[in-house]
């Protein structure tokens, strides 16, 4: 009944009804923002919108209007730079923070047999304090003068330009924190996200006001599951079960769409963010892109598709391109995110439904457990029927504009296996076929990890980039097939990845946001900004693999690699360098 009522309410948003990107004009919807960003005062559009105001919003906007009046609405770049210096403070709103639960030698290190990998894991554990931040008291006193949304607990930032908490990054960061026994820090990060959920009605892309209107893949339930599996903290589940249900309701209320396939109607989720104007943190880039469109095209159409792609986390990729011929060729002007039904979003949501059902059962709420369990079963069924491709032997995104599956390799194709959104009989029947698909694609044969796609478009979420979260998804998906062959393959891919990351870390002393599948350990390229180091989810994924497979992975290939853990530090490091 609920799904029927939701379907009745599905309508197309009229441009005049579009909400602004956020309710803070200075940072989201003002002539001030437009003038400053289009003047290109800073090479990265995110720089300006991360500045704090020295005065309140009204005083800042009034002063800018006076500048426009004085200059006949034609201020010079120097005028704008002077205004920004006078009215904005580029000092960070965050301060460094040392988590009390950080341990120099967490117990999991003892599970890692290979000495080179054990030392690598320890080095990654040592990075956590360098990425730990908390909101400054001055920001808490005047939160309205910053684009940062204050949060109660300290947290781990991804790194580089990403100086705030990010929704889907947090999943792999929290996983890494739990592996290294930083349970209180992980708990605080989850509670920060729940604070954002209650403040906005959903968890935004990140803890900035300019992310207000969009979310990211709904991984809150999966994060809480990780925390519960580590701590068995049933009171935490009891306290926040309503938050899980609130998030599920948000996605059902705002992202649901009905579509036809083979004369049947299916109801699944898509990414769709209809709000006015460019993304503030990429204002210049979005505005310039809109100028390339046909003059009869409403720029808010492309802005919505840009924001929707950003909500997916895959900003940007041919995955969201629909050309005039209906394929995934073209460029950003071909973005059509709203007309793609994503495999991974629906797999994650099916997983969230089932996790919530399981938690309600643990809490002895059988009616709520049955409600969410039934929806999870229906979601898995829709994924199987609408997104499984019998010919290819894998799941594909679905193009609702042209009513056809998008038969291209993307790592997201494996998300149902990752999120256990596959019924056991179906898995038993088709698991081997998925492995065949992967081998036929040749996507597993690169020295630097599994690339996110096989299309070299120049976009950062395409070939040759290998992204840590997607490598995690692929390896875990293959492991979850449950066969001897799949288990062996998962370990092999994990070893390739950890070796590649270790190679890059040895050379550069840094972990990167993304890597080059063609060159083991080299950072990836493309996109709207320069390479970012740190890096939260990259550290988390390596720790995940070493925690899961540390007893068997080796950092070098040699006849006596099995005895590597018995070598001295000096001998082990010499071997690693020689290789």
Swiss-Prot record:
Note whether Flavoprotein occurs among the keywords.
no
Question: Membrane-spanning regions, if any?
Answer: none
Q: What is this protein called?
A: Trehalase
Q: Name one Pfam family in it.
A: Trehalase
Extent of the signal sequence: 1-15
PANTHER family attached here? Answer: TREHALASE
Q: Which residues are glycosylated?
A: 29, 58, 205, 331
Q: Which organism is it from?
A: Bombyx mori (Silk moth)
Question: EC number(s) per UniProt?
Answer: 3.2.1.28
**Gene Ontology cellular-component annotations:** basolateral plasma membrane
Tell me which InterPro entries the record gives: 6-hairpin_glycosidase_sf, 6hp_glycosidase-like_sf, Glyco_hydro_37, Glyco_hydro_37_CS
Q: Tell me the classification of the organism that encodes this protein.
A: Eukaryota, Metazoa, Ecdysozoa, Arthropoda, Hexapoda
Q: Where is the composition biased (Polar residues)?
A: 560-569
């Amino acid at each position: 009944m609920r799904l029927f009522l939701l379907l009745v309410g599905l309508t197309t948003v009229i441009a005049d009804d579009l909400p602004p990107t956020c309710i803070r004009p200075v940072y989201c919807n003002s002539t001030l923002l437009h003038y400053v960003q289009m003047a290109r005062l800073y090479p990265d559009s995110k720089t300006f919108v991360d500045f704090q105001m020295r005065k309140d919003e009204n005083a800042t906007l009034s002063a800018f209007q006076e500048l426009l009046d004085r200059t006949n609405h034609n201020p010079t770049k120097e005028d704008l730079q002077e205004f920004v210096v006078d009215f904005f403070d580029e000092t960070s709103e965050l301060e460094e923070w040392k988590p009390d639960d950080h341990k120099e030698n967490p117990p999991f290190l003892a599970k890692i047999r290979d000495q080179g990998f054990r030392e690598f894991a320890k080095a990654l554990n040592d990075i956590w304090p360098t990425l730990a931040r908390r909101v400054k008291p001055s920001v808490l006193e005047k939160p309205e003068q910053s684009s940062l949304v204050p949060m109660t607990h300290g947290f781990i930032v991804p790194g580089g330009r990403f100086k705030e908490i990010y929704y889907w990054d947090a999943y792999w960061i929290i996983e890494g924190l739990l592996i290294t026994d930083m349970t209180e820090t992980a708990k605080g990060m989850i509670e920060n996200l729940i604070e954002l959920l209650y403040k906005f009605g959903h968890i935004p892309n990140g803890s900035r006001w300019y992310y207000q209107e969009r979310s990211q893949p709904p991984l809150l339930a999966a994060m809480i599951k990780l925390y519960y599996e580590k701590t068995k903290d049933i009171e935490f589940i009891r306290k926040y079960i309503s938050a899980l249900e609130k998030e599920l309701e948000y996605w059902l209320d705002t992202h649901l769409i009905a579509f036809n396939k083979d004369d049947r109607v299916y109801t699944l989720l898509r990414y769709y963010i209809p709000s006015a104007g460019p993304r503030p943190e990429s204002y210049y880039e979005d505005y310039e892109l809109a100028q390339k469109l046909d003059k009869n095209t409403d720029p808010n159409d492309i802005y919505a598709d840009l924001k929707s792609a950003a909500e997916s986390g895959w900003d940007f990729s041919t995955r969201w391109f629909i050309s005039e011929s209906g394929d995934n060729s073209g460029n950003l002007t071909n973005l059509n995110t709203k007309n793609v039904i994503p495999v991974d979003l629906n797999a994650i949501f099916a997983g969230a439904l089932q996790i919530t059902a399981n938690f309600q059962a643990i809490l002895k709420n059988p009616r709520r457990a049955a409600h969410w369990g039934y929806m999870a079963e229906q979601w898995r069924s829709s994924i199987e029927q609408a997104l499984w491709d019998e010919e290819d032997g894998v799941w594909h995104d679905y193009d609702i504009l042209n009513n056809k599956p998008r038969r291209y390799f993307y790592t997201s194709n494996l998300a149902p296996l990752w999120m256990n959104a596959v019924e056991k009989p179906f898995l038993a029947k088709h698991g081997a076929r998925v492995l065949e698909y992967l081998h036929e694609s040749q996507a597993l044969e690169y020295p630097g990890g599994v690339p996110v796609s096989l299309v070299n478009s120049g976009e950062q979420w395409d070939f040759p980039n290998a992204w840590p979260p997607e490598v995690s998804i692929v390896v875990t998906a293959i492991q979850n097939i449950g066969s001897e062959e799949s288990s062996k393959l998962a370990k092999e891919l994990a070893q390739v990845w950890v070796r590649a990351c270790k190679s890059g870390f040895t050379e550069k002393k840094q972990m990167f946001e993304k890597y080059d599948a063609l060159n083991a350990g080299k950072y990836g390229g493309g996109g709207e900004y320069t390479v970012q180091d740190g890096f939260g989810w990259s550290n988390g994924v390596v720790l995940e693999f070493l925690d899961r497979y540390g007893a068997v992975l080796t950092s070098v290939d040699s006849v006596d690699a099995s005895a590597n853990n018995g070598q001295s530090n000096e001998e082990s490091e010499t071997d690693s360098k020689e290789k």
